[in-house]
């Protein structure tokens, strides 16, 4: 089966990348920027909040092993989709919760996933569905961050392990074998 792609944002891309790298059926995860107005943005520019881009991940997946809807359910369970333009202490539109469908089918599934997530939250889901736009890969040092520098980064050590615990507790069937 051909690889399909999903683009989602849910806070710091180091943290979302770490979650999706562990999913059976995911063949690639790339951190990057999408949804803004600046061509070829840098991390520094995106962090400045003036480009309009979100920190996001582009997930390559085998739809015979994990569906787009499954990926969205995992995303909603491993970040707080009720926080507007932030995740924890990361504040700004670059940390927004968003889905960037690459097809009409993904658009419809995104709407259904938001409805499923809303049934599990008392506060309103603020995740946006945004038009697919140009994807800009983040700089090399951001790729596979948790497996490298992230293990020594205090921020990552505080944020990523709880996300992974949620993943393994709720979605054990989708967790890639070690």
From Swiss-Prot:
Active-site residue list: 12
Enzyme class: oxidoreductase
GO biological process: protein modification process
EC number annotated for this UniProt entry: 1.8.4.11
Annotated catalysed reactions: L-methionyl-[protein] + [thioredoxin]-disulfide + H2O = L-methionyl-(S)-S-oxide-[protein] + [thioredoxin]-dithiol; [thioredoxin]-disulfide + L-methionine + H2O = L-methionine (S)-S-oxide + [thioredoxin]-dithiol
Function: Has an important function as a repair enzyme for proteins that have been inactivated by oxidation. Catalyzes the reversible oxidation-reduction of methionine sulfoxide in proteins to methionine.
Family note: Belongs to the MsrA Met sulfoxide reductase family.
Protein name: Peptide methionine sulfoxide reductase MsrA
UniProt organism field: Erwinia tasmaniensis (strain DSM 17950 / CFBP 7177 / CIP 109463 / NCPPB 4357 / Et1/99)
């Amino acid at each position: 089966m051909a690889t399909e792609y999903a683009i989602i944002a849910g806070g710091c891309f180091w943290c979302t990348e770490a979650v999706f790298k562990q999913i059976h059926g995911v063949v690639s995860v790339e951190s990057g920027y999408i949804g803004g107005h600046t061509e070829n943005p840098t991390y520094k520019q995106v962090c400045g909040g003036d480009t309009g881009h979100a920190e996001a991940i582009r997930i390559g997946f085998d739809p015979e092993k994990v569906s787009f809807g499954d990926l969205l359910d995992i995303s909603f369970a491993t970040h707080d989709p009720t926080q507007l333009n932030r995740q924890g202490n990361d504040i700004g539109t670059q940390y927004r919760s968003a889905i960037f469908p690459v097809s009409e089918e993904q658009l419809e599934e995104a709407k259904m996933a938001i409805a499923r997530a809303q049934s599990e939250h008392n506060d309103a889901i603020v995740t946006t569905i945004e038009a697919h736009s140009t994807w800009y890969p983040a700089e090399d040092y951001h790729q596979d961050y948790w497996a490298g520098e992230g293990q020594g980064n205090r921020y990552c050590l505080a944020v990523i392990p709880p996300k992974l615990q949620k993943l393994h507790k709720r979605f054990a069937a989708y967790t890639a074998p070690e």
